[in-house]
Amino acid sequence: MAGFGEPGIDTVDAAGLTVGVVAARWHGELTDHMLERAVAAADACGARSVVARVAGSVELPVVAQALARRYDVVVALGVVVRGATAHFDYVCRSVTDGLTRVALDEGKPVGHGVLTVNTIEQARDRAGLPGSAEDKGWATTVAVLDAALAVRGLARTTQRVGFDA
C-alpha cells in the first residue's frame, strides 16, 4: 500500500539550501505537475531551486550528477509505466542505480521521485494532481531537504561515538 507508514513531514526549515530539480518530459502532464510541486515545496521550506529538463528517465542520473556538483540536494522526477516488454525493468533499475550512485559519489542527498508504476492511473494517483492520494513531487523534495539537514547536523557533531570513542 503506497503511503502506508509515511513520515508525514510537510516542510522543514531549509533556508539557505539549494535544490537542483531535474524532471523527465515523458508523461509531461504528470511530470510537469510534479515539477511544479517540487519547486513549491522547496519554496515552502525556504530553499532556492533550479530546474533542468531531460527527455526521459534514463537521462536523469547524468544531469542529477551535474546538479549535485553545484547544489546542496537534487530531486529527480519522472514516470515509468510498465509495458509488455522487459524495458520497464531495465529503465527502473538503471535509473535507481544511477541516482543512488550519484548520491554516494557526490556525497549529496538525491531524491528518487521517479514513479515506477504498472498503470498510468497509478501514476496519476501519486503525482499530486487534484484528487491524487499522494504528492511525490512535494514529498520527495521535503525528504531530500530533511536528509541534507541531517547530513549537515552530523558534520557539526564533534563527539565521537562507537567502539573507537
Swiss-Prot record:
UniProt function note: Catalyzes the formation of 6,7-dimethyl-8-ribityllumazine by condensation of 5-amino-6-(D-ribitylamino)uracil with 3,4-dihydroxy-2-butanone 4-phosphate. This is the penultimate step in the biosynthesis of riboflavin.
Stated name of the protein: 6,7-dimethyl-8-ribityllumazine synthase
Recorded catalytic activity of this chain's protein: (2S)-2-hydroxy-3-oxobutyl phosphate + 5-amino-6-(D-ribitylamino)uracil = 6,7-dimethyl-8-(1-D-ribityl)lumazine + phosphate + 2 H2O + H(+)
Domain of life: Bacteria
EC number assigned by the record: 2.5.1.78
Family assignment from sequence similarity: Belongs to the DMRL synthase family.
First and last residue of the signal peptide: none
